[in-house]
C-alpha cells in the first residue's frame, strides 16, 4: 500500500543565480576571487545543481577555471 503524502510540504525555495545577482556578464580567468566560489575545498569544480548557474555559465566557469589552473592562479587539487 503506498504511503500517504504529506500535505504540509512546502516547495523548495528558489535560490538566485549568483552570477546574475552580482551582475557578472563575463567570467574572466584572472578573477580568482570569483572562481574560488565555484571550486570545492578539494579543488574540484562544483556542479550546476550546487552553484545554481545556467549551463552556458557553467561552461564559461569551467573554461575559466581550467585556464586559471594552467596559469597557476588556482591549484589543480589537494589530497
Curated annotation (Swiss-Prot):
Regions annotated as coiled coil: none
Keyword entries, A-Z: Ribonucleoprotein, Ribosomal protein, RNA-binding, rRNA-binding
GO CC, one annotated term: cytosolic small ribosomal subunit
A Pfam family of this chain: Ribosomal_S18
PROSITE patterns, per database record: RIBOSOMAL_S18
Ranges of compositional bias, category Basic and acidic residues: 1-11
Origin: domain of life: Bacteria
GO biological process, one term: translation
InterPro entries: Ribosomal_bS18 (IPR001648), Ribosomal_bS18_CS (IPR018275), Ribosomal_bS18_sf (IPR036870)
GO molecular function, one term: small ribosomal subunit rRNA binding
Chain residue ranges for the region called Disordered: 1-24
Record's function text: Binds as a heterodimer with protein bS6 to the central domain of the 16S rRNA, where it helps stabilize the platform of the 30S subunit.
Similarity field: Belongs to the bacterial ribosomal protein bS18 family.
UniProt subunit comment: Part of the 30S ribosomal subunit. Forms a tight heterodimer with protein bS6.
Protein's recorded name: Small ribosomal subunit protein bS18B
Amino acid at each position: 500500500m503506498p504511503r500517504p503524502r504529506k500535505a504540509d510540504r512546502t516547495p523548495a525555495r528558489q535560490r538566485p543565480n549568483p552570477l546574475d545577482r552580482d551582475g557578472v556578464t563575463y567570467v574572466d580567468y584572472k578573477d580568482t576571487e570569483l572562481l574560488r566560489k565555484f571550486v570545492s575545498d578539494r579543488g574540484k569544480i562544483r556542479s550546476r545543481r550546487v552553484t545554481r548557474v545556467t549551463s552556458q555559465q557553467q561552461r564559461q566557469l569551467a573554461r575559466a577555471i581550467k585556464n586559471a589552473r594552467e596559469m597557476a592562479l588556482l591549484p589543480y587539487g589537494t589530497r
